[in-house]
């Protein structure tokens, strides 16, 4: 619904987190998108635990593996893919290290389900000559930089010359 209102072409697949690493490659091959959102449900299993231990997260390991599979697809098919990955309280640093351009949640907070969509829309409508950073997006996000951050990406919109 959000993408239809924005007049963006999108495909939405509801895939359980544990299956995402196994499904993402073939979906990328079939749909050949410019932007990929890997999300679902996540959370820290013990809030007083070490932030940097993958075993302390419900589903971050699956998102990380899905990002790696997406980057493998990108290398094999010479694709330039922008990836958002993560959910509430996800292991942000590992998602970025795996290859996500934007991820949640640097402050290990809950994010609104619409926030990854806002990031994807901003990438989609920004000219491909402009490099977007979280500084270009965070004011539109409910939780700002605490919920989502990243290394950035070039926009995907193309200029049309007549």
Annotate each language-model stretch with its function:
Residues 2-11:
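Short helix-loop-beta junction
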Residues 12-19:
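Short beta->alpha junction loops
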Residues 20-24, 91:
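Short acidic active-site motifs
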Residues 28-42, 100:
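Proline-aspartate-enriched helix->loop->beta-strand connector
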Residues 44-45, 112:
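Short glycine-rich, flexible loops that bind phosphorylated cofactors or substrates
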Residues 45-63:
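A short, glycine/acidic-enriched catalytic loop
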Residues 64-111:
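Catalytic cores of nucleophile-dependent amide-cleaving enzymes
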Residues 107-162:
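C-terminal functional extensions of proteins
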